[in-house]
Amino acid sequence: TGGLDTVAVRLPASAAARKLIEYSGGYVAAPSANRSGRPSPTLARYVQEDMDGRVEMILDGGQVGIGLESTIVDLTVSPPQILRPGYVTEERLEQVLEGVDMDAALLNEDSGQAPKAPGMKYRHYAPKGELVVVEGSSDRVAEYINRAAEADRHAGEKTGVLGSRELLAEYRADVIKCVGSRGDEESIARNLFAVLREFDEEGVTKIYSESFSS
């Protein structure tokens, strides 16, 4: 319930998760397999890192098919309200709902309203290092990232770049990671959190990323 008087219901796409629900003979009430303040685990080994000693068993369903956080929508109000943006975008929701709004607390941090959804009230889904997203044309993005990363290295930072396959060869940093081709949004979504965790594992303190918004 997230502290509210409503209940969120989710039907997972994972075949392993569906089998678990089937074998349970009903419904499963459980929190997500991650601790707040870390990138969401997309592999069983990341769940083990976060939950070691806290759970007795981990069901390994392989790499996740999507990888991004789920979209949370409040259907108790009209029009429906997005409480947490996720893989299912506002545009896709509008195709099946007669209009949809965004939670005012997400649009304006100074609104005085507290976000209703888990993960929107504090640092969440974030790597340990500082993450900077750079927007613009491909050549300008690569030029800016390389210049900024060089300055950061001189300042003692361990730098990382999160980039697309198309631009990967253009970057200069201590650690360079590819999340997929710019034309393959599903691949980018599936790999994003795993790559952020890899930056943590390699001790990267400053991460620069291309913008992958469509």
Tell where the protein language model's regions lie, with residue ranges.
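Active-site-adjacent structural elements in enzyme catalytic cores
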Residues: 1-214
